[in-house]
Amino acid sequence: MTNIRKTHPLMKIMNSSFIDLPAPSNISSWWNFGSLLGACLAIQIITGLFLAMHYTADTTTAFSSVTHICRDVNHGWIIRYLHANGASMFFLCLFIHVGRGMYYGSFTMSETWNIGIILLFTVMATAFMGYVLPWGQMSFWGATVITNLLSAIPYIGTILVEWIWGGFSVDKATLTRFFAFHFILPFVITALVMVHLLFLHETGSNNPLGTSSDSDKIPFHPYYTIKDLLGLLFLLILLMVLVFFSPDLLGDPDNYTPANPLSTPPHIKPEWYFLFAYAILRSIPNKLGGVLALVLSILILAIIPMLQTTKQRSMMFRPLSQILFWVLTADLFILTWIGGQPVEHPFITIGQMASILYFSLILIIMPTVSLMENKMLKW
């Protein structure tokens, strides 16, 4: 008798995706982050659902409803901090996942890569709107500053900003719609994840060598299910250490002050995972130029496949490209640090230099070095 998992219409899909899926035999732990992102998404949806049961999306009660969750709801504090720090874990895994794709040349699978970029934008939008919901000082002013950037768009900018606000400033209408979008977008993300996996399973996974692994496949279960569970264990340990020992480590103290439109915080800054893009935005003196640079800092991922000049897919055997990849990583760390600093000397200059280096590395230096490596292959 045939196994039910191979005949049942629903279980057949699960079986071909997670059990009998042929996977390359040599994929390393850098390939764990896809499943970790799935786990993060599940944690965020579950904790978010429980938070939404007690949260009120109204400017007069939003802040106190979050306080109520932490003080009065059974285990409310743990749900709230799991959600807040879960977002940090989500972005940590996202950045590593994208970096892995760049390092090993996974961007050659264009549909999977492009859906991934759409996913990145959607997750960033969701996280931004979620940060506004507690209605603290940084929530309010962060929302004001970031939405105001759209006013830099010629002709329609001002109308667009007021349309998003639902009035002439960030107010009750803005909070209500941000809550609605923050609630619905994770389900949109889940749908996009399914499309992402659909396209991935059309081509099969890449591997560290960047070569075809058709001749050497192993079943996903039990080999990679066990491997993913180990990764999940490490992720949960890190998340629990954050939640139980220093839940506010990655947050901003200003967000413990209720939103006050009459008093601006000394340094308006987003959560750590947006700081690199915020630093690029601030490094350009012109408003429209800054907004364009901000969008391009992420959208540049879409043109990486077009900039590929190398004859080898992976960076595994390209030492010069490896060095540049880690220079780019260090540059992103510098941008993240600069984004959290005040706008004054020497931070302005460092931010501008790091921004120029970021775009130069991806657009000019890395493709040029790849061409040099092609020449060196002939020696």
UniProtKB/Swiss-Prot annotation:
What species was this sequence derived from? Cheirogaleus crossleyi (Furry-eared dwarf lemur)
InterPro entries named in the record: Cyt_b/b6_C, Cyt_b/b6_C_sf, Cyt_b/b6_N, Cytb/b6-like_sf, Cytochrome_b, Cytochrome_b_C_euk/bac, Cytochrome_b_N_euk/bac, Di-haem_cyt_TM
Protein name (record):
Cytochrome b
Cofactors demanded by this protein? heme b
What CDD domains does the record point to?
A: cytochrome_b_C, Cytochrome_b_N
Q: What is the lineage of its organism?
A: Eukaryota, Metazoa, Chordata, Craniata, Vertebrata
Q: Which family does it belong to?
A: Belongs to the cytochrome b family.
- Name the positions where heme b b562 binds: 83, 182
Which GO terms are recorded in the biological process aspect for this UniProt protein?
Answer: mitochondrial electron transport, ubiquinol to cytochrome c
Where are the membrane-spanning stretches? 33-53, 77-98, 113-133, 178-198, 226-246, 288-308, 320-340, 347-367
Q: Which PROSITE patterns match?
A: CYTB_CTER, CYTB_NTER
Provide one Gene Ontology cellular component.
respiratory chain complex III
Cofactor: how and how many bound = Binds 2 heme b groups non-covalently.
Instruction: Locate the residues binding a ubiquinone.
Output: 201
Q: What Pfam family is a match, any one?
A: Cytochrom_B_C
